[in-house]
């Protein structure tokens, strides 16, 4: 899979987005730094290993960078709710990302059911997204040659998820003992922002259709606002086909006829569910990259955010998604030759099929896969 850079995003500027599309990887680069001008110059980025297998996957990328000479330096910030007393603060993480080209590579942070701070319902993931205003989560669902799927179809669609409001607003309270009220926040401003983002994405990447996913038949005000806003934005893009679909029907359609989708846009909770369902269509959590995008910052992280705690330390996790995240990050940083070469090396290893992790029916370790990618890497 080759990559090319699209340097502007007219209606959502200054946006930053890296995503693969069709047979190539297409990359938006608005707030990214200039490429290195000196031979030995390296660009710095923040890494957040996270919990579970996150550190193993991040360290795999670090080893690939070291062995291949990719001109990147990492500053590590440890964020964890599992090891809360050892965790750095959100403020430190934000400062690190800000001084390191506004970019981070991140593993999954396990959400704890325990309140570490009295009255604080937001987990580290939500606090980080809100601190950086990472309003759009973008996950590209694409069939990789060499991975056998149950449906046998070539899929290529993108999920755009609003991730700063909705059910993730952390507004919960106990009315009386045994009765909990949880509030869902929906605003026209954020619905319009994510809708425009999705339509701009479709326009810039040559896609033909945007599907708004909702439950307005039941949540007539909240999801009704989202749907009406998407319908209004769609009128500004007459060349892009628009349709709406109820979330429960969407799940059925994804399982029965997933090839019908192109760009999907949806509120927060639905996006979380659909991301994971769709990842299962193309090989699972280990093969789908994603990114969280804001006006000034971008965090590259696997599209299916599972810490996989039970596999921690066993070197059995599939690093494909994390390595592809790193490739997208390199394109974002204008290191296109490096990003393209890394992505191609992953594609070659997966297609060849000699080195497969357990989730894909093989016995290779996380390190085995990374070593195979290094062997295939050419620049």
From Swiss-Prot:
NAD(+) binds at residues 44-72. SUPFAM superfamilies: Isocitrate/Isopropylmalate dehydrogenase-like. This is Probable isocitrate dehydrogenase [NAD] subunit beta, mitochondrial. One of its GO terms (cellular component) is mitochondrion. Mg(2+) binds at residue 248. The record marks 168, 215 as: Critical for catalysis. InterPro entries: IsoCit/isopropylmalate_DH_CS, Isocitrate_DH_NAD, IsoPropMal-DH-like_dom. It is found in: Mitochondrion. Binds 1 Mg(2+) or Mn(2+) ion per subunit. GO terms for molecular function: isocitrate dehydrogenase (NAD+) activity; magnesium ion binding; NAD binding. It comes from the Eukaryota. It is an enzyme of class 1 (oxidoreductase). The keyword Mitochondrion applies. PANTHER family: DECARBOXYLATING DEHYDROGENASES-ISOCITRATE, ISOPROPYLMALATE, TARTRATE, ISOCITRATE DEHYDROGENASE [NAD] SUBUNIT BETA, MITOCHONDRIAL. Signal peptide: none annotated. Heterooligomer of subunits alpha, beta, and gamma in the apparent ratio of 2:1:1. Belongs to the isocitrate and isopropylmalate dehydrogenases family. Keywords: Magnesium, Manganese, Metal-binding, Mitochondrion, NAD, Oxidoreductase, Transit peptide, Tricarboxylic acid cycle. It catalyses: D-threo-isocitrate + NAD(+) = 2-oxoglutarate + CO2 + NADH. Residues 1-31 form a transit peptide. Pfam families: Iso_dh. It comes from Caenorhabditis elegans. Substrate binds at residues 129, 161, 248. GO terms for biological process: isocitrate metabolic process; tricarboxylic acid cycle. Its cofactor is Mg(2+); Mn(2+). The gene is idhb-1. Its EC number is 1.1.1.41.
């Amino acid at each position: 899979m080759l990559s090319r850079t699209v340097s502007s995003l007219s209606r959502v500027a200054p946006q930053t987005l890296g995503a693969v599309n069709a047979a190539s990887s297409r990359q938006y680069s608005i707030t990214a730094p200039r490429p290195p001008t000196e031979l030995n110059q390296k660009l710095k980025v923040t890494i957040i290993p996270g919990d579970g297998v996150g550190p193993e996957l991040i360290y795999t990328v670090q080893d690939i960078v070291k062995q291949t000479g990719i001109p990147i330096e990492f500053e590590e910030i440890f964020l964890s709710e599992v090891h809360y007393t050892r965790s750095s603060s959100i403020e430190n993480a934000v400062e690190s990302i800000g001084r390191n080209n506004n970019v981070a590579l991140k593993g999954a942070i396990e959400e704890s059911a325990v309140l570490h701070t009295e009255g604080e319902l937001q987990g580290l993931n939500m606090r980080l997204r809100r601190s950086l205003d990472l309003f759009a989560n973008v996950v590209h669902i694409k069939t990789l040659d060499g991975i056998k799927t149950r449906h046998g179809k070539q899929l290529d669609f993108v999920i755009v998820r609003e991730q700063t409001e909705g059910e993730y607003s952390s507004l919960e309270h106990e009315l009386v003992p045994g009765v909990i009220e949880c509030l869902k926040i929906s605003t026209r401003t954020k619905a319009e922002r994510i809708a425009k983002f999705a339509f701009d994405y479709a326009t810039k990447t040559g896609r033909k259709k945007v599907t708004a996913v909702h439950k307005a038949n039941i949540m007539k005000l909240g999801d009704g606002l989202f749907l009406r806003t998407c319908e209004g934005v769609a009128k500004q893009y007459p060349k892009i086909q628009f349709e709406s679909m109820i979330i429960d029907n969407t799940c059925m359609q994804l399982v029965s006829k997933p090839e019908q989708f192109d760009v999907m846009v949806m509120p927060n909770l639905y996006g979380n569910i659909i991301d994971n369902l769709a990842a299962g269509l193309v090989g699972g959590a280990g093969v789908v990259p994603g990114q969280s995008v804001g006006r000034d910052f971008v965090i590259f992280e696997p599209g299916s955010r599972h810490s996989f705690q039970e596999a921690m330390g066993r070197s059995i996790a599939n690093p494909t998604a994390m390595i592809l995240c790193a490739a997208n990050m390199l394109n974002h940083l204008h290191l296109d030759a490096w990003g393209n070469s890394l992505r191609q090396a992953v594609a070659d290893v997966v297609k060849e099929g000699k080195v497969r992790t357990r989730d894909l029916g093989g016995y290779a370790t996380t390190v085995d896969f990374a070593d195979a990618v290094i062997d295939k890497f050419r620049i």
